[in-house]
Amino acid sequence: MTAILERRESESLWGRFCNWITSTENRLYIGWFGVLMIPTLLTATSVFIIAFIAAPPVDIDGIREPVSGSLLYGNNIISGAIIPTSAAIGLHFYPIWEAASVDEWLYNGGPYELIVLHFLLGVACYMGREWELSFRLGMRPWIAVAYSAPVAAATAVFLIYPIGQGSFSDGMPLGISGTFNFMIVFQAEHNILMHPFHMLGVAGVFGGSLFSAMHGSLVTSSLIRETTENESANEGYRFGQEEETYNIVAAHGYFGRLIFQYASFNNSRSLHFFLAAWPVVGIWFTALGISTMAFNLNGFNFNQSVVDSQGRVINTWADIINRANLGMEVMHERNAHNFPLDLAAIEAPSTNG
């Protein structure tokens, strides 16, 4: 009888836990995805802060030339970064217990792999948590779909690209200058500026910014006056009010006359779908572009594509970009190899008389 009572109490405790985890009445919704999200993001954040402050230099290129990234080793907020895991480790799973010592783990950049893998798992769970909360509230799932764009972008630069290149040392460093270095080297090796998917991503980000500014300014300019001239127009809105807060007909008429009639949305729902979809699709394409260039399906190459009637090359902007790429590649990992890969790929002339 005692055993039965204990089992019922155990089930009751588990049931209360399940109800608490999935309750939409909590100040912050946890959810089943949150059970995994909270420890992974806390781990990634904690290790990032500690490593950014105090991690010793990392042998990123695997040539016994450690690179310093932490504040205590001479960096500032701009130059500091979590240095990627060493090329000597490659794509191997490298937890602390796989190293002979903590010093070896730090020297080979173990914190980078720990942070990145926990971070990617955490943000994926955050996306799942968005869907879970939407489902429990009876909402549509598009918030999680929109968030999938930055999740895809982060996964591309932190996981897919290192897999394609064969080493976590090619992943994006976790810092400001490290991000810029990653971008410059990516351009040098993959000509990303000439990749159509990157162009779509640029159109998505800048177009999304433009459309957001246009929408916000149109709404703000066509608010329905509910206050006196001595009060802020914002005071005329009450949270949860049923009445429209701005005149969409006036905004539609203004924009239709500013450009042309059919450039303006007359349906608020389709307008807001467009505002969400444009940047999301653009960032999806960018993530897809990074993922294809990870396996060296690079941007367009129009080098020396214009010649005169005598066969002499007429330089274009493509040739200018190509020369810049070679210059950046020469400066990249200059102690790891003597020549950039593009130049070293040419077969050496024969020396046999």
Curated annotation (Swiss-Prot):
The chain crosses the membrane at residues 29-46, 118-133, 142-156, 197-218, 274-288. One of its GO terms (biological process) is response to herbicide. The keyword Methyltransferase does not apply. It is a multi-pass membrane protein. The modification N-acetylthreonine is found at T2. The record marks H190 as: Stabilizes free radical intermediate. Signal peptide: none annotated. SUPFAM superfamilies: Bacterial photosystem II reaction centre, L and M subunits. Chlorophyll a PD1 binds at H198. Residues 345-353 form a propeptide. Its main location: plastid. [CaMn4O5] cluster binds at D170, E189, H332, E333, D342, A344. One of its GO terms (molecular function) is electron transporter, transferring electrons within the cyclic electron transport pathway of photosynthesis activity. PSII is composed of 1 copy each of membrane proteins PsbA, PsbB, PsbC, PsbD, PsbE, PsbF, PsbH, PsbI, PsbJ, PsbK, PsbL, PsbM, PsbT, PsbX, PsbY, PsbZ, Psb30/Ycf12, at least 3 peripheral proteins of the oxygen-evolving complex and a large number of cofactors. It forms dimeric complexes. This is one of the two reaction center proteins of photosystem II. This is Photosystem II protein D1. It comes from Spinacia oleracea (Spinach). The lineage of its organism: Eukaryota, Viridiplantae, Streptophyta, Embryophyta, Tracheophyta.
